[in-house]
From Swiss-Prot:
Keywords: Cell membrane, Endonuclease, Hydrolase, Membrane, Nuclease, RNA-binding, Transmembrane, Transmembrane helix. It holds the Pfam family KH_1. The gene is rny. The lineage of its organism: Bacteria, Bacillati, Bacillota, Bacilli, Lactobacillales. This is Ribonuclease Y. Its main location: membrane. One of its GO terms (cellular component) is plasma membrane. It comes from Lactobacillus acidophilus (strain ATCC 700396 / NCK56 / N2 / NCFM).
Amino acid sequence: MNTIIMIPVATAIVSLLVGTVTGYAIRKHSWEQKAQNAQNDADHILADAKAQVAAAEAEVNAQKQAAIAVKQSAENTKKEKILEAQEQIRDYRQKTEDELNSKKDNLARQENRLQQREDTLDHKNSLLDEREAGLTEKEDQLKQQNASLKAKLDEADELVGIRRQKLYDVAKLDKDQAKKIVLDQLSDELVKERAEMIRNSNEEVMAKADRYANQVIIDAIQSSAADTVAETTVSVVDLPNEEMKGRIIGREGRNIRSFEALTGIDLIIDDTPKVVTLSGFDPIRREIAKRAMERLIKDGRIHPARIEEMVDKARKEVNDDIYEAGESALMELGIHRMNPELVKTLGRLKYHTSYGQNVLSHSIEVGKLAGTMAAELGLDEKLAVRAGLLHDIGKAIDHDIEGSHVEIGVELTRKYHEPDVVVNAIAAHHGDVPKLSFIAELVVAADTISSARPGARSESLENYIRRLTDLEKIAKSYQGVKQAYAIQAGREVRVMVEPDEISDDRTVILARDIRNQVEKELDYPGNIKITVIREKRVVAIAK
């Protein structure tokens, strides 16, 4: 019975234990599940928090970078503005200094000219004083001679009276016979005295003759006159046929525009059969244009690139001819040992005219005349030839350098160490400075003989060339201008600018400034068109 009772109790106890264990296991699993869920939730919350923190940090960093970029941009802009302002200040300061230096140079040149004129006047005054002193001395000598003659005449009259009385007393001659004897004796004495005076005068004249002979001869030569044939400002190129005119013009006239821009010469195509005309005041440019056009016509391929190639070849060929012309002039006159740069400058005179007269031919002629006269006068013939040849050397580059051709010639010859006599002859051949040697006088005389022949020179042509030269100088005086050409007989100026220095907007201002300066400084008939050309060329080569 007890056993029977114990079994249910044991069963109940076991069931209770099993239930307790099972419940504990279930409850433990539930607790672990909740803990795991709580841990997962905590991890998710922590991850979200970290993500939000990272996003916030990224946003803060982005804002910092943006702030830094804005600050850097502001600093760069500030630096650029400062640099731009400094550059403008430097440009303005440089421009102001250049203007001041230019004005100082002009004032210095004017002062030099005034000083030279003052020296010339002083020299002339001293010469006049010397002549006046000489005349005063001669006047005193004449007075002394007159007094001496009067005294001698009085003495002669006294002697005549004494001798007449003696003749009356001794010879008992009548008055007429006595008078004849006395006059004969007196005549012989006067003849001797006059011969002595003439002999003394001749000796005095011969003593001065050697000093004044050269000056007298030179003064006589300077009274001569002379001149040669004038040249034109156009060149004509023959065409094989009329169809060539269309090829020269090109599509919409692009070939003409390219040719004129590269050479600075007007290309005139009219109704004249089988010819085109090249017009320009600069003979060197015109010669380059003529040779380039002849090459293009012979080649047949006429387009802007080919035109540029032919113009470059013609320019090199003309430069070679210029040097050869200088050497030929030296060989013709027998001159040796001259600086090559001076020879090249001398050769440029072949393509220059003065009042229509070819300057190189004129210079050679002056050299020959000066040498011939120097040989006749016993002076240094070679030095006279050299001075005569170089007297107008400044005209070769007076279109490119400011100053008169005399000033430029003096500067050139001094730079290349020419003799002082040659430099003075150049400086004095227009009377700007005193002549310090007879050779300088001979150069003036030879220049007059060569350049003053009737009909040789043309004043209107020289004025025309000077006006076109002044137009180009005004255009080239502005910063950024690469080249300028006066064309259409001075009715148009084409100005080529550097594209990296002058913007499109600046070209408008540049054209206006050039126009204003031309209107202010030049006198001209009609209107002048100012054309500013800005061309940027980019070349890429595919290999």
